[in-house]
Amino acid sequence: CQFQAHLYYPNFLNRYSQSLGDTGVVRVVMEENIKYPMYGPDYHKRTQYSADLIHQKAMEWIDKQDGKQPFYGFFTYTLPHAELAQPNDSILKGYKKHFFRDKTWGGSEGSRYNAVEHTHAEFAGMITRLDSYVGEVLRKLKEKGLDDNTIVIFSSDNGPHEEGGADPEFFGRDGKLRGLKRQCHEGGIRIPFIVRWPGRVSAGMVNDHQLAFYDVMPTFCELMGDKAFPKKYINKKIKNDCFDGISFVPTLLGDDGKQQKHDFLYWEFHE
């Protein structure tokens, strides 16, 4: 459920792996976590940290790739988010030495999240933890000799939020842009989109091309040489169905003159 998905020490995680023989979603109970309550100080005695577990599975999957077949990995890391929770290891302890105890985040939304003391240290630690995950992914690709022939994209889903009492201005997270998550101003929808493709995407290049995530599929289709993708993936049972995405391959390759652009970006938000 959405509530468990928003916790870093959840009661369960869902798995669906055809390679493991799954025919549907499998609920994996976090046996060590459920020994302790979801609220109160004992919550932090839970040991099965979802972000670490997701990253562990991602690394195991990369380790199985041998370069003989194309592969596609979509790693949906959840760091950082509204809940402030993580192992009290060297990452967090290092930040606790540099950030003061301040107002608590959490405990103010009907006790949806457990409150913590070192809120900014916790948030900084979660960002550093994510950074370490990305570094491990890149090192694993290099270790297996796959890094020069693999496109790596790092991005986010939305701008900064206020859930749980978070302060979007701290760390300069708002980038001085107007708007927050769920809003259509730049602050809500303008996010990092970093691409690493050695020998094809120029290092350090910055481009202001506007795109949305539905542009990723046609981009990958073009890179694979599948030029018929717009006709293949429309629903012929729906009148006037169309393919909204536009490939941004020209932008990646530095050929802005050939880049087709959106007249506008459109999506719907349901929650």
Question: Which residues does each predicted region cover?
Answer:
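Glycine-rich, aromatic-lined ligand/substrate-binding cores of catalytic
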Residues: A212-G225, I238, C242-T251, D255-K258, ...
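Active-site-proximal cap/lid insertion segments
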Residues: Q2-M217, C221-C242
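N-terminal sensory regulatory modules of PAS/LOV and PAS-like folds
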Residues: C1-Q2, V152, F248, Y266
